[in-house]
């Protein structure tokens, strides 16, 4: 259950739409103000973005989300200042952008009168953390209201994103697009070879004996069509050697190492299926090729759902970018704002104690 909760909270970082305005806006938060909480983080709280006349994004908003993410992913390290130091420093840029995304989408949702029932928010909080929220007060100086605000904003952002992106994507993916993509996959597959093979290792007391045994193994495999590992091993053992047989490999061209591909291509298949012995530190190697054929795909009926899902993912990126650009235009977002906030010359937003 804890793993599921961690994944659920970590998924908040998947929202990658970011924008905002008024870099350095002071509002009612002096840039010199300093708040310290039990997490070992000194927060230089100030307004980072002004969304509208009623809504601003502050350093504390970002820290609150960092606190929730840290506790969700690393509860066993909640009292480790060094662990938080590493986590907060690494995650700050990503979480900063995600919080700005959420504020902008929440503002958009408000305009469109899209709301989340408080009961749903409380249920989500309980599903993630249980009913005991005291660790947030003890280690992060966060109230239940602070937690509610973060989770509520995330859920609102997810809902509006679903309406503005996912619903449009579903309408765009047509049966014709699926068929065209399948045909393209078929054409690509026809250019790919698929190799089915094993690698045999022959060991013996001397190099001469090993080569002699390897020659007999090669001869036997090239004479018949049957594959009998046990009989082959018995034959090698009777000659004073040892046979080690790999599992059966099924590999496409791109999945083959250069050495394996070279060895397989030297086999005169299908007239032969076992190549010449190759010297190796672990013993003599014999490559046994069972099949080399053009890659084939399953029927469209079996791949349709998979192809449709892939197309939706691709179109979602496009729709998300469109939605992002509209939000930027509406709220006057300048991409350089994020760069300024994260630059080395920018005023510190928080300090690790």
UniProtKB/Swiss-Prot annotation:
- Give the range the annotation lists for the signal sequence: 1-24
Query: Is Manganese there in the keyword field?
Result: no
Question: What highest taxon heads this organism's lineage?
Answer: Bacteria
State one molecular function term (GO): peptidyl-prolyl cis-trans isomerase activity
Query: Record's family?
Result: Belongs to the chlamydial CPn_1058/CT_355/TC_0634 family.
Classification via Gene3D superfamilies: 3.10.50.40, Porin chaperone SurA, peptide-binding domain
> Mind telling me what this protein is named?
Uncharacterized protein TC_0634
Please provide the record's keywords in A-Z order: Signal
């Amino acid at each position: 259950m804890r793993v599921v909760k961690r994944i659920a909270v970590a998924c908040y970082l998947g929202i990658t739409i970011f924008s905002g305005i008024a870099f350095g806006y002071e509002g009612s938060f002096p840039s010199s103000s300093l708040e310290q909480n039990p997490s070992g983080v000194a927060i230089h709280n100030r307004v980072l973005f002004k969304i509208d006349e009623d809504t601003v994004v502050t350093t504390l908003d970002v820290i609150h989300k960092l606190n929730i993410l840290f506790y969700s992913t690393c509860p066993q390290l909640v009292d480790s200042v060094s662990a938080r130091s590493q986590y907060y420093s690494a995650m700050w840029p990503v979480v900063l952008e995600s919080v700005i995304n959420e504020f902008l989408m929440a503002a958009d949702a408000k305009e469109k009168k899209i709301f989340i029932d408080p009961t749903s928010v409380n249920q989500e909080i309980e599903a993630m953390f249980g009913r005991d929220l005291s660790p947030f007060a003890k280690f992060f100086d966060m109230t239940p209201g602070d937690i509610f605000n973060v989770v509520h904003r995330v859920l609102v952002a997810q809902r509006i994103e679903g309406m503005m992106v996912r619903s449009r994507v579903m309408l765009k993916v047509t049966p014709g697009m699926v068929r065209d993509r399948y045909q393209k996959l078929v054409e690509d597959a026809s250019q790919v070879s698929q190799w089915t093979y094993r690698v045999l290792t022959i060991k013996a007391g001397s190099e001469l004996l090993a080569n002699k045994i390897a020659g007999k193994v090669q001869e036997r495999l090239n004479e018949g069509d049957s594959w009998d590992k046990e009989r082959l091993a018995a034959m090698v053992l009777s000659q004073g050697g040892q046979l080690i047989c790999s599992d059966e490999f099924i590999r496409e061209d791109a999945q083959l190492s250069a050495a394996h591909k070279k060895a397989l291509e030297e086999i005169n298949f299908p007239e032969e299926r076992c190549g010449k012995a190759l010297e190796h530190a672990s013993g003599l190697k014999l490559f046994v090729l069972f099949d080399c054929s053009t890659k084939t795909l399953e029927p469209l009926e079996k791949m349709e759902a998979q192809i449709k899902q892939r197309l939706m993912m691709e179109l979602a990126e496009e729709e998300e970018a469109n939605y992002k650009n509209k939000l930027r235009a509406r709220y006057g977002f300048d991409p350089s704002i994020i760069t300024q906030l994260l630059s080395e010359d920018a005023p510190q937003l928080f300090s690790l104690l």
